[in-house]
Each structure stands twice: as structure tokens, then as C-alpha cells.
A protein has these predicted regions:
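Short acidic, glycine/proline-enriched helix-loop-strand junctions
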Residues: 62-75, 119-127
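Short, well-structured N-terminal submotif of metal-dependent ribonuclease cores
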Residues: 1-37, 51-64, 106, 116, ...
Length: 127
């Protein structure tokens, strides 16, 4: 089974049960993959909750995704991820840099994301 990473937006939609926001291709990949999130997704979820962009806490999202889909937080060493992220010059968004870098560092794993900038700059993006 393939390992795939979830971007923050996809994690939120899945936790909210809003599958209508996902494409058939994304849903198929979710069904057929072992799912991971970068720890940076947890941090971004916390930030989004703090600024009232989402109502669920980071912990609530991650617990729900783990219980329903078996999603785990990636435990890869952080230094090699950052070594990749410093070269992701296509974005100023530190969350996107690290999330993409986690997928790259794990054998160029697919990253399920609707983010247009990520889709343009990471060849293994699934949407």
C-alpha cells in the first residue's frame, strides 16, 4: 500500500466530514493509502484554530483522523526535512515548505492537496 501525506486543508475537510470538497482522485488516493501528516500540519491546525479559521483544535482533528482513517503524524527526523525545505523557494509559506518537504523526504510520497501552488511545484501532488 502506498504512503500518502495529507495537506492541512484536506485534513480539515476530512475531520469535518466535508467530502464534497475533495476530488474523486483525492478520495481514491485516501482510500488506497497509508496516510500521514507532517507535524507541521498539527502546528498549522493550531494556528488556524487560534485565529478562528477553524473550530476544531489540532488535537481534535488529529484524533478524529486517526480514529476514522488511521492517519498518523510522521515521525521522521526534522533536520533532513528542513534541509529540503530551505530549497523550496517557490513559496514564502513555512507550513507549505515543510509539509511538501516531508513528502519529498519520504521517497517522494504523494501529497494530497488542493493548494494550487503546491500542485504546480510538487510533481507528486494528488488532486
Amino acid at each position: 500500500m502506498t504512503t500518502a501525506y495529507l495537506d492541512t486543508n484536506v485534513a480539515v475537510w476530512l475531520a469535518q466530514g466535508d467530502l464534497t470538497r475533495l476530488t474523486p482522485t483525492a478520495l481514491d488516493s485516501i482510500r488506497k493509502s497509508n496516510l500521514l501528516v507532517s507535524p507541521m500540519v498539527a502546528l498549522e491546525l493550531t494556528y488556524l484554530h487560534e485565529i478562528n479559521r477553524i473550530t476544531l483544535t489540532s488535537q481534535d482533528v488529529l484524533l478524529k483522523l486517526r480514529a476514522e482513517l488511521g492517519v498518523e503524524v510522521c515521525d521522521s527526523a526534522f533536520a533532513p526535512i528542513i534541509a529540503i525545505a530551505v530549497n523550496e523557494k517557490w513559496t514564502r509559506d513555512p507550513f507549505d515548505r515543510v509539509i511538501v518537504s516531508h513528502a519529498k523526504a519520504n521517497g517522494l510520497s504523494p501529497l494530497i492537496s488542493s493548494d494550487e501552488a503546491i500542485r504546480k511545484n510538487y510533481v507528486k501532488t494528488v488532486w
